[in-house]
Amino acid sequence: MAAPRMPPSRLSGIMVPAPIQDLEALRALTALFKEQRNRETAPRTIFQRVLDILKKSTHAVELACRDPSQVEHLASSLQLITECFRCLRNACIECSVNQNSIRNLDTIGVAVDLVLLFRELRVEQDSLLTAFRCGLQFLGNVASRNEESQSIVWVHAFPELFMSCLNHPDKKIVAYCSMILFTSLNAERMKDLEENLNIAINVIEAHQKHPASEWPFLIISDHFLKSPELVEAMYGKLSNQERITLLDIVIAKLVGEEQLTKDDISIFVRHAELIANSFMDQCRNVLKLTSEPHTEDKEALVTIRLLDVLCEMTSNTELLGYLQVFPGLMERVIDVLRVIHEVGKESTNIFSPSDSLKAEGDIEHMTEGFKSHLIRLIGNLCYKNKENQDKVNELDGIPLILDSSNIDDNNPFMMQWVVYAVRNLTEDNSQNQDVIAKMEEQGLADASLLKKMGFEIEKSGDKLILKSNNDIPPP
């Protein structure tokens, strides 16, 4: 039975039960704090009373942690704890005065300790799960837009709370914990993550498991990607699937509606170094898919995603210049293009041109566009860059690119990317134009194919000239 209550009294404009001792009183406060005017006029004494109830109820949880047989007696305490957290959570909404009052009572430390106790219980009770969720919601709200509260939350919660909750089986607990981490992180605290990489990896895993949850995604895109040091340290410890997840977010950042700022560009140049080196080290992993065509090799899929990132990076004019002079990158791209082109000709495999659509789950679908993206990357690297134009010629890359122009369902838009690459290879480069013109004269390049691609060969005296017409397909 609920303890008897004194008649309600008015405190600073809010009708509250006095003293606050029972569940009904807490529920009344929770409802009152849904209104902004009530939050703004709440006296600090209310939060002291709520904290007293929270501390008293915590003893039952501590006892259950020491003696599992006591878990069945937790129901009433969990109800009170839940309502305390709801009350405090609501009180903090867009009200820095209440956030400060609650923080100064050391309620944050009590709440974090209690949440960690919940994780220790490891029992399946809906009431426990609800209290757990409400506790995390309170910590998120008390820290929201309040730097002092964020600092206190970080002191108490890092690293134990994040280690305990980011991998919790309940998706709401993962989401609320991610909200706390997102709210509390800043440049200085990112250094703490570098020393606790498992937390950063858990965030990647959380996004992988719960892609619909916005908080893990925002942590990665808005915090992790601003720290090249963290990304590099973390990348080496990620599983292949986690690497794919991270690279997908890098792509999302590159192609997003918001353009990269100057600060972003300097950071992404560092990321570009990691991506380019990783691709150069692993690019031949795609060949594993030819020996085991029914196996989804994650290493190969990472290589495919690395190429996708490089294509998007070189589509950004601010990042292009850095990658155009990246040592060994062009050579490696030409090398892997030549290898998969030859492998595709030798026997029927996933790199052979196909005129039939594949089911989404097929491994052919996983490698879709790889060859055309290699040609796209070559075209990007040659954009207004004579050194790279000449390098492709020296590596016999021009015949290779022209020979890759067959229609291929595994490589949509192959023709368009070949045209794009040829255009960038020959722009203001008479030597490369001569190479293609002579290939046509010698029968090594199909004139009808060149015309279809938007080029034609004209004779001027003893010279052959490659010209583009107005019907060049768009890239």
Swiss-Prot record:
Keywords: Cell cycle, Cell division, Cell projection, Cytoplasm, Cytoskeleton, Methylation, Phosphoprotein, Ubl conjugation. Disulfide bonds: none annotated. One of its GO terms (cellular component) is perinuclear region of cytoplasm. The modification Phosphoserine is found at S12, S77, S430. The modification Phosphothreonine is found at T82. Its main location: cytoplasm. It is found in: Cytoplasm, Perinuclear region; Midbody; Cytoplasm, Cytoskeleton, Cilium basal body; Cytoplasm, Cytoskeleton, Microtubule organizing center, Centrosome, Centriole. The keyword Manganese does not apply. In high cell density areas; cerebellar cortex, dentate gyrus, hippocampus, anterior olfactory nucleus, primary olfactory cortex. Homooligomer. Interacts with GNB2. Interacts with IQCB1. Interacts with OGT. Interacts with PLK1. Belongs to the ataxin-10 family. This is Ataxin-10. It comes from Mus musculus.
